Amino acid sequence: YANEYQAIRPALKKDIRAVHNLIQRGVRNEELVKRTRAELERRIQDYFVFEVDRNPVACVALHPYPDDNKAELASMYVDPRYENQGIGSRLIAYAEAQARARGYETLFCLSTQAVNYFIHKGGFQLGTPDDLPPLRREAYERSGRRSQVLIKPLTEPVKSLPGTSHSDSAS
């Protein structure tokens, strides 16, 4: 997704400070789990940024669990000055498209505060810790955060939006 002023793209090393600052804001609001700069540096290839006028104003991570054919949507944060503009929904759709392109069967996320957002805007459904890959479940249980597990199967075809039917009518 891109236009003159807005774009979603993979995060680069030069984005580490901006991504870290976005995540820190989410941590202060108790919306996100703390990430160190070192962790970001190690996993920057998992992150995507949403830019406005070439400035990152939102981020999301897609952490792969290839042995389980699952991917985790994590660390999603939108600068409050850019909220209610559909950026979060676009980040979810972008991460989902990346997960589908890589052949993952399930996208999952953990949330303590945005459960309704992920269900209503992201198309996720409530899951259980049993839906998590074993490595992720261990970390979930150690964290003690008691986040809600949300899952989204990626094996079904993408549903078309209302008013955009793809029927094979002869014209």
Where are these regions (language model features)?
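Short amphipathic alpha-helix that is part of the acyltransferase structural core
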Residues: 1-34, 51, 72, 146-171
